[in-house]
């Protein structure tokens, strides 16, 4: 996984995808009511909100705060037939292969002024159009691979022989429009097909885009209920946002947006919900380093051991890793300072097998 987590935003034309993307990144990509206006994938980098950083900066007298970052890629309008090169099909597929997760914006609002490419509002149909295109693209990749592996298997290659039945199983599932992530593959099987970068194997999230009138209470929105049910059956995540509201928030200062959210009765913005859901989807956590220069968050996959976490900062620290000096953020905050935490015996030295936890405040000892 890349240093910055990368989420690809996809959706049919006119579902609010570019409006949401512009709000996310304030990048001002062209969000016209016009299919295919986003030809090159626009990339926007956003800070991952984490209130713990300000506490650490205050405690350590840090000159600056560096939050973790997340990259959102606006992937040009997908339409029916993209896997066969319709619309911007081939470009779409090459761009989406590079992302860590896919967020699919689904239109769950009625607005006669914004035409839907299929002429009516039906979120499940929209999801299935996109999923079918992704399944068809994967089917092509797996069938090509199968042809190659069959030749190798004939020469008696053991690995190729083991892989063939797996490929056949995946082909059968994709033919029934079943995403790879819903086919129950185990770790070993996923490793076997990793280099194929299959689109339907990527973690997926549905972003239900509702009207601004419903943002405080969308319990009566039948479209959202259907998407929630669909996501649950597929084991995918779901976030409900109003792209219009997000674009209004994007124009405001931090203080203004906090007041605006409070007026709407919301605890956090749709963007914050989207980032948190993406973190959960990819099993990510943050650890911290803090000192006079900076208080900084580093993103790692849950289950990462200390030396590999150190490698996020610099490969030399991973190579020369001796120990990690660690205190949990909660303990540190309760004690009020690093010294007080040390006196209470809450700062511990951990070796190379230590599995990092979310909120670990860390100082790595290493030798180059």
Enumerate the predicted regions with their spans:
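Conserved G1/Walker A P-loop phosphate-binding module
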Residues: 1-115, 143-144, 149
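C-terminal-of-GTPase-core extension/linker across diverse P-loop GTPases
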Residues: 1-10, 15, 21, 148-355, ...
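Glycine-rich, flexible loop/turn motifs
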Residues: 27-35, 42-44, 52-55, 84, ...
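Amphipathic alpha-helical transducer elements in NTP-driven molecular machines
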Residues: 36, 50-53, 66-72, 86-100, ...
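Short capping/connector residues at structural and topological boundaries
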Residues: 36, 41-44, 51-53, 58-65, ...
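Conserved Switch II/interswitch segment of TRAFAC-class P-loop GTPases
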Residues: 44-49, 76-86, 97-158, 173-186, ...
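Short, flexible surface segments
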Residues: 98, 357-358
């Amino acid at each position: 996984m890349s240093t910055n987590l990368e989420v690809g935003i996809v959706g049919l034309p006119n579902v609010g995808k570019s409006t949401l993307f512009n709000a996310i990144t304030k990048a001002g990509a062209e969000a016209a009511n016009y299919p295919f206006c986003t030809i090159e994938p626009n990339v926007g980098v956003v800070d991952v909100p984490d209130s713990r950083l300000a506490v650490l900066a205050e405690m350590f007298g840090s000159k600056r705060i560096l939050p973790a970052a997340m990259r959102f890629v606006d992937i040009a309008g997908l339409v029916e037939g993209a896997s066969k090169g319709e619309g911007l099909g081939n470009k779409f597929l090459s761009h989406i292969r590079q992302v860590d997760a896919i967020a699919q914006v689904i239109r769950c609002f009625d607005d006669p002024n914004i035409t839907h490419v299929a002429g009516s509002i039906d979120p499940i149909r929209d999801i299935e159009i996109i999923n079918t295109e992704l399944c068809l693209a994967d089917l092509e990749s797996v069938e090509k691979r199968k042809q190659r592996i069959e030749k190798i298997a004939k020469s008696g290659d053991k690995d190729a022989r083991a892989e063939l039945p797996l490929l056949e199983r995946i082909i059968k599932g994709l033919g029934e429009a079943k995403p790879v992530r819903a086919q129950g593959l185990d770790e070993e099987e996923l490793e076997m097909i990793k280099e194929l970068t299959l689109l339907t194997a990527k973690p997926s999230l549905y972003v239900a885009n509702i009207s601004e009138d419903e943002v405080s209470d969308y319990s009566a929105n039948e479209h959202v209920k259907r998407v929630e049910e669909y996501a649950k059956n597929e084991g995918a995540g779901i976030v409900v946002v109003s792209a219009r509201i997000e674009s209004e928030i994007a124009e405001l200062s931090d203080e203004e947006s906090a007041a605006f959210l409070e007026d709407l009765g919301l605890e956090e913005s749709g963007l914050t919900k989207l980032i948190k859901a993406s973190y959960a989807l990819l099993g990510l956590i943050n650890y911290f380093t803090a000192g006079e220069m900076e208080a900084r968050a580093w993103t790692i996959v849950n289950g990462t051991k200390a030396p590999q976490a150190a490698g996020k900062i610099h490969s030399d620290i991973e190579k020369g890793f001796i120990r990690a000096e660690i205190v949990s953020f909660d303990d540190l905050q309760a004690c009020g300072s690093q010294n007080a935490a040390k006196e209470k015996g809450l700062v511990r030295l951990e070796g190379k097998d230590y599995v990092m936890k979310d909120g670990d405040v860390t100082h790595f000892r290493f030798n180059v």
